[in-house]
């Protein structure tokens, strides 16, 4: 049935005029270009860090996402206390926020917040392959797609931006290394670092402000004109300085003006409110890569203690019976 439909479509296409064929081909190219552009914009946020920094965690412990997301907000990370080698386990990432609030989008309009995170694992730990995941864990993960920070750093995972209302809590499926096959890994306690954000950043990687930021006056003087710019919003604020010069501060669509015409202002005085409602946070946890031989040794040790205690109790009862018999005699 499907083959017949395909043949019919091809036959109909061959009967079209050359002009119609060109129009269809043009629409096809336009659709592909649009999808590529949209997907590139959506996936751009993690790329900022990936392209600009070889390692997302600086020497002082700060995760580089904080360079663009200036406000501090809490995040939570939950992992098992210990895992055995070559074992699949899950990490729970929580990015809490009030889901009723709206953020300023790039076009100046209000919309829901998105979230994103970077998870820095110990060397050897990485994303668990899908064929190793139990069905229950697959359901918890859902449609989330985690990707390595780079081809050489599979122990660093990133995701985002994704809808915060759906994914403010994320389950990350992980697999532990096996020191028997990976000589760079030892049975030790390791740290895991998390960086998570909700909402858009206030700065771009080049240091320029986004429209999700506070805008200040660049000079001291009097506001002589406030001119709307474009259909999407934004303003040009004309300031006449004390020496008679004219300075124009541009405010993009999004932030709300808190100054008026003929108002006297000082340099660095806020011209707008701070529209940012999101923020970035860091958390860390520790996990022990447990040696199975140690676990077995501990179990044997505990069993030995239990048997020893049992024999002591039995011996005590035996002695008590002998003493009781001697007293009766």
Swiss-Prot record:
<dbReference type="InterPro" id="IPR011054">
    <property type="entry name" value="Rudment_hybrid_motif"/>
</dbReference>
<keyword id="KW-0732">Signal</keyword>
<feature type="binding site" description="covalent">
    <location>
        <position position="65"/>
    </location>
    <ligand>
        <name>heme</name>
    </ligand>
</feature>
<keyword id="KW-0813">Transport</keyword>
<feature type="transmembrane region" description="Helical">
    <location>
        <begin position="295"/>
        <end position="315"/>
    </location>
</feature>
<comment type="subunit">
    <text>The 4 large subunits of the cytochrome b6-f complex are cytochrome b6, subunit IV (17 kDa polypeptide, petD), cytochrome f and the Rieske protein, while the 4 small subunits are PetG, PetL, PetM and PetN. The complex functions as a dimer.</text>
</comment>
<keyword id="KW-0479">Metal-binding</keyword>
<dbReference type="InterPro" id="IPR024094">
    <property type="entry name" value="Cyt_f_lg_dom"/>
</dbReference>
<dbReference type="InterPro" id="IPR024058">
    <property type="entry name" value="Cyt-f_TM"/>
</dbReference>
<keyword id="KW-0793">Thylakoid</keyword>
<keyword id="KW-0472">Membrane</keyword>
<dbReference type="Pfam" id="PF01333">
    <property type="entry name" value="Apocytochr_F_C"/>
</dbReference>
<feature type="signal peptide">
    <location>
        <begin position="1"/>
        <end position="44"/>
    </location>
</feature>
<feature type="binding site" description="axial binding residue">
    <location>
        <position position="45"/>
    </location>
    <ligand>
        <name>heme</name>
    </ligand>
</feature>
<keyword id="KW-1133">Transmembrane helix</keyword>
<keyword id="KW-0249">Electron transport</keyword>
<keyword id="KW-0349">Heme</keyword>
<keyword id="KW-0150">Chloroplast</keyword>
<keyword id="KW-0602">Photosynthesis</keyword>
<keyword id="KW-0812">Transmembrane</keyword>
<dbReference type="GO" id="GO:0009535">
    <property type="term" value="C:chloroplast thylakoid membrane"/>
</dbReference>
<dbReference type="GO" id="GO:0015979">
    <property type="term" value="P:photosynthesis"/>
</dbReference>
<keyword id="KW-0934">Plastid</keyword>
<keyword id="KW-0408">Iron</keyword>
<feature type="binding site" description="covalent">
    <location>
        <position position="68"/>
    </location>
    <ligand>
        <name>heme</name>
    </ligand>
</feature>
<dbReference type="GO" id="GO:0009055">
    <property type="term" value="F:electron transfer activity"/>
</dbReference>
<dbReference type="GO" id="GO:0020037">
    <property type="term" value="F:heme binding"/>
</dbReference>
<dbReference type="GO" id="GO:0005506">
    <property type="term" value="F:iron ion binding"/>
</dbReference>
<dbReference type="InterPro" id="IPR036826">
    <property type="entry name" value="Cyt_f_lg_dom_sf"/>
</dbReference>
<dbReference type="Pfam" id="PF16639">
    <property type="entry name" value="Apocytochr_F_N"/>
</dbReference>
<feature type="binding site" description="axial binding residue">
    <location>
        <position position="69"/>
    </location>
    <ligand>
        <name>heme</name>
    </ligand>
</feature>
<dbReference type="InterPro" id="IPR002325">
    <property type="entry name" value="Cyt_f"/>
</dbReference>
<comment type="function">
    <text>Component of the cytochrome b6-f complex, which mediates electron transfer between photosystem II (PSII) and photosystem I (PSI), cyclic electron flow around PSI, and state transitions.</text>
</comment>
<protein>
    <recommendedName>
        <fullName>Cytochrome f</fullName>
    </recommendedName>
</protein>
<comment type="similarity">
    <text>Belongs to the cytochrome f family.</text>
</comment>
């Amino acid at each position: 049935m499907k083959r017949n439909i395909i043949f019919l479509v091809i036959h109909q296409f061959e009967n079209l005029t050359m002009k119609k064929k060109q129009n269809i081909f043009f629409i096809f190219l336009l659709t592909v270009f649009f999808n590529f552009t949209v997907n590139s914009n959506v996936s751009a946020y993690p790329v900022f860090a990936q392209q600009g920094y070889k390692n997302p965690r600086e020497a002082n412990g700060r995760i580089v996402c904080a360079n663009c997301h200036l406000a501090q907000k809490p995040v939570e990370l939950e992992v098992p206390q210990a895992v055995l080698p070559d074992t699949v386990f899950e990490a729970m990432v929580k990015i809490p926020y009030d889901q009723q609030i709206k953020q300023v989008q790039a076009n100046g309009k209000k919309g829901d917040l998105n979230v994103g995170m970077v998870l820095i694992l110990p060397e050897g730990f990485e994303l668990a392959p899908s064929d190793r995941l139990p069905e229950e864990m697959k359901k918890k993960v859902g449609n989330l797609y985690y990707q390595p920070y780079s081809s050489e750093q599979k122990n660093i995972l990133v995701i985002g931006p994704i809808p915060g209302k759906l994914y403010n809590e994320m389950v990350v499926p992980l697999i532990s290394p096996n020191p028997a096959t990976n000589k760079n890994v030892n049975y030790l306690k390791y740290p895991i670092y998390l960086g998570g954000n909700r909402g858009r950043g206030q700065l771009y990687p080049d240091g320029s402000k986004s429209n999700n930021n506070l805008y200040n006056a660049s000079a001291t003087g009097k506001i002589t004109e406030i001119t709307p710019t474009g259909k999407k919003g934004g303003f040009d604020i004309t300031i006449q300085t004390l020496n008679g010069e004219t300075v124009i501060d541009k405010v993009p669509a999004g932030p709300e003006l808190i100054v008026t015409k003929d108002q006297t202002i000082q340099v660095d005085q806020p011209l707008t409110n701070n529209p940012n409602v999101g923020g970035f946070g860091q958390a860390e946890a520790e996990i022990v890569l447990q040696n199975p031989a140690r676990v077995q040794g501990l179990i044997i040790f505990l069993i030995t203690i239990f048997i020893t205690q049992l024999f002591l109790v039995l011996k005590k009862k035996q002695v008590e019976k002998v003493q009781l018999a001697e007293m009766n005699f």
